[in-house]
Amino acid sequence: QQVPGZKETKIKVPIAMFGGSGNYAXALYIAAVKXNAV
């Protein structure tokens, strides 16, 4: 089980790097990472 707070943190980091416009790409990236992790 993933901790909700942990998920929020992982999402906020890429957004800070790529800016608000990168939130969609960040979501795809995180989804890919989670899929690979599982």
UniProtKB/Swiss-Prot annotation:
Source species, domain of life: Eukaryota
Which portions of this protein are annotated as coiled-coil regions? none
Q: Where in the cell is it found?
A: Mitochondrion; Mitochondrion inner membrane
GO process annotations (BP): ATP biosynthetic process; proton transmembrane transport
Signal peptide positions (record): none
Main localization category: mitochondrion
* Keyword Protein biosynthesis part of the UniProt annotation: no
Q: Name one GO cellular component term.
A: mitochondrial inner membrane
What keywords is this UniProt entry annotated with?
ATP synthesis, Hydrogen ion transport, Ion transport, Membrane, Mitochondrion, Mitochondrion inner membrane, Transport
Role of this protein? Mitochondrial membrane ATP synthase (F(1)F(0) ATP synthase or Complex V) produces ATP from ADP in the presence of a proton gradient across the membrane which is generated by electron transport complexes of the respiratory chain. F-type ATPases consist of two structural domains, F(1) - containing the extramembraneous catalytic core and F(0) - containing the membrane proton channel, linked together by a central stalk and a peripheral stalk. During catalysis, ATP synthesis in the catalytic domain of F(1) is coupled via a rotary mechanism of the central stalk subunits to proton translocation.
Q: How does it assemble?
A: F-type ATPases have 2 components, CF(1) - the catalytic core - and CF(0) - the membrane proton channel. CF(1) has five subunits: alpha(3), beta(3), gamma(1), delta(1), epsilon(1). CF(0) has three main subunits: a, b and c.
The UniProt family comment states: Belongs to the ATPase delta chain family.
Quote the protein name from its UniProt record. ATP synthase subunit O, mitochondrial
